[in-house]
Every structure is written in structure tokens, then in C-alpha cells.
């Protein structure tokens, strides 16, 4: 059996350097761009791409950030330390959308992808039909100490990262899905997870700014798993309370990786959100036509 997922590469310039970025897609309709978690890749969204209830109405896309999955790092990577920044992340998303000609996509991001969704709502709400942040908050207090131990020669970085992430998966996750989620972390490149956490832990702090998000310009949905102790439900609730019009949902029996740890449970929360977006955005576009 062939799955309906197609994988391709797109060449884009990021930070004035050429990059060859891998992405997968499936479905037809309004574009739904999915952003993976720190240290992982677009495979986390494979279940969305094989769900006919979604792909019958949405063109689902997910790219691997440079250094992640099947996207190679840029030339000269061996001579520099990787640190993801807010500006670089926003540039990456906008450049990908422009390269593929995505007209006002809905963006769904998880963890670091969820946090950057808040930045997109601040910087460029007019570019998107709606924004969905999974496991997202303006700031999360680190539940780990210094990250230098994630990248050192006497430690297997991939196995350490997967072990670190294992506790963030809800106990209700099917064993197969749990281990698939952890496998992606075990495969991560050297220093990549640590570099992503620079954005997640320090540089991407949005406290004092999220109250400027205007949800009348772009609807915002925040969904967080009840078992997530990296971005806790209280973190998300506190962020949502500062954004008038933000829709906050705490997802039962889910952790930090809802789309990959328990796809069937996650779709119960995602499908109504997508349906609401089609209804509200469609009505708005009809009025503006």
C-alpha cells in the first residue's frame, strides 16, 4: 500500500546562505503548515497526512528544519555552534511559505513550533488564516539544568535526548507511538537539540509582549496536554489569559507530543479546531470578497 505522502526538497536562502530543505505534504485545500518540536523532524505529523478527514480539505505540509531529519546543515556547519534564534526561525517559516506560494496558511506548531506561533501572531498576523500553538506559552521555567551535557563526546546525545523526552509522554500513549516518538530524538544530530533549546529556554522569551497579540487579525488557538510538565497547562492558561480572544484547550490523556504520541486522541481535539477555522475564516473571506 502506498501512502499519499509526497516528499520533496526546496532550495531557499536563510541568513543569506543557501539551504536545501526537505518537506512532506499530502491532501488538497487550504494549506496547513506543521512545525515540529525541538530536536525532531516532520515525521511527527505523518498521521495527520494520512487522515482522510483532514487531507480531504487541507493541504498538510511539514518541513524538516535545517540540521533536522532529511534537511542537511548549511556548508560550514562544522565551524560554528548551532543556536536557534527567533529571527532565524521566523525567516525560515516565511521563506518556506514564499517558496511554495502558500497563501495565508494555517500554521500548527508544537513546543518550539508552538512558541514561534506566538511570535508569528505578533509580527505578521496578516500572513496567516489562523495559528495553532500546541504545548505553547510565553515562557516556560526550565525543568532541567545546564544543557551542556546534551552535547559532549562521552555521552550518546541521541539516547540521552530520547530518555529526557520519555517522561513528557502521557501514560495513555500506545507503546508503538511512544517509541516512535522517542526514536526521532535518538536520531538527532550532534548539538541540534541543545541548539533548539536556546530558543525555547532563553532567547524566545515572550513575557511582556503577548498581550499585544490581536486575535481579531488572526485567530489563535492554544492546546496543551495535561501531562506536559515542560509547558504545563498552567503555563498555557496564563499565556491565554493575557491574549484577548485566544482559545485555550487542555487536552486530556496527552503529553508534550500529541500528534505523534497518541494521534487518535489528538485528532479529537484538532478536528473541531480545523472545522471552526474553516467556518470563521471562510465567512470572513466571503465578506471581504
Regions inferred by a protein language model and the residue ranges of each:
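Catalytic active-site module of serine/aspartate enzymes centered on a nucleophile-bearing elbow/loop
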Residues: 246-289
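Conserved HGGG/HGGXW glycine-rich cap/lid loop of the alpha/beta-hydrolase fold
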Residues: 15-75
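Active-site loop/oxyanion-hole signature of alpha/beta-hydrolase fold enzymes
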Residues: 16, 56, 61-108, 268
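Conserved alpha/beta-hydrolase catalytic His-Asp/Glu region
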Residues: 142-143, 158-214
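Flexible "cap/lid" loop of the alpha/beta hydrolase fold
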Residues: 118-123, 128-159
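Gly/Ala-rich beta-loop-alpha elbow adjacent to hydrolase catalytic centers
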Residues: 109, 113, 117
Amino acid at each position: 500500500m502506498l501512502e499519499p505522502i509526497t516528499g520533496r526538497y526546496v532550495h531557499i536562502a536563510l541568513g543569506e546562505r543557501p539551504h536545501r530543505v526537505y518537506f512532506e505534504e499530502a491532501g488538497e485545500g487550504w494549506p496547513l503548515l506543521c512545525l515540529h518540536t525541538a530536536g525532531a523532524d516532520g515525521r511527527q505529523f505523518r498521521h495527520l497526512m494520512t487522515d482522510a478527514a483532514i487531507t480531504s480539505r487541507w493541504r498538510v505540509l511539514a518541513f524538516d528544519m535545517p540540521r533536522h531529519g532529511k534537511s542537511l546543515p548549511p556548508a560550514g556547519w562544522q565551524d560554528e555552534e548551532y543556536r536557534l534564534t527567533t529571527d532565524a526561525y521566523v525567516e525560515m517559516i516565511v521563506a518556506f511559505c514564499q517558496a511554495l506560494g502558500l497563501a495565508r496558511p494555517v500554521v500548527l506548531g508544537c513546543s518550539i513550533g508552538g512558541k514561534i506561533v506566538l511570535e508569528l501572531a505578533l509580527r505578521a498576523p496578516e500572513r496567516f488564516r489562523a495559528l495553532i500553538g500546541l504545548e505553547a506559552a510565553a515562557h516556560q521555567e526550565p525543568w532541567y539544568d545546564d544543557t551542556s551535557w546534551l552535547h559532549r563526546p562521552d555521552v550518546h546525545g541521541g539516547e540521552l535526548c530520547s530518555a529526557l523526552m520519555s517522561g513528557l509522554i502521557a501514560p495513555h500513549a500506545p507503546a508503538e507511538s511512544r517509541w516512535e516518538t522517542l526514536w526521532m530524538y535518538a536520531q538527532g544530530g550532534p548539538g541540534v537539540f541543545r541548539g533548539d533549546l536556546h530558543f525555547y529556554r532563553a532567547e524566545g522569551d515572550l513575557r511582556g509582549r503577548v498581550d499585544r497579540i490581536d486575535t481579531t487579525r488572526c485567530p489563535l488557538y492554544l492546546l496543551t496536554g495535561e501531562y506536559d510538565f515542560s509547558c504545563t497547562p498552567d503555563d498555557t492558561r496564563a499565556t491565554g489569559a493575557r491574549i484577548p480572544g485566544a482559545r485555550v484547550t487542555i487536552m486530556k490523556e496527552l503529553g508534550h507530543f500529541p500528534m505523534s504520541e497518541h494521534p487518535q486522541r489528538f485528532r479529537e481535539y484538532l478536528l473541531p479546531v480545523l472545522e471552526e477555522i474553516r467556518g470563521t475564516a471562510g465567512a470572513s473571506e466571503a465578506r471581504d470578497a
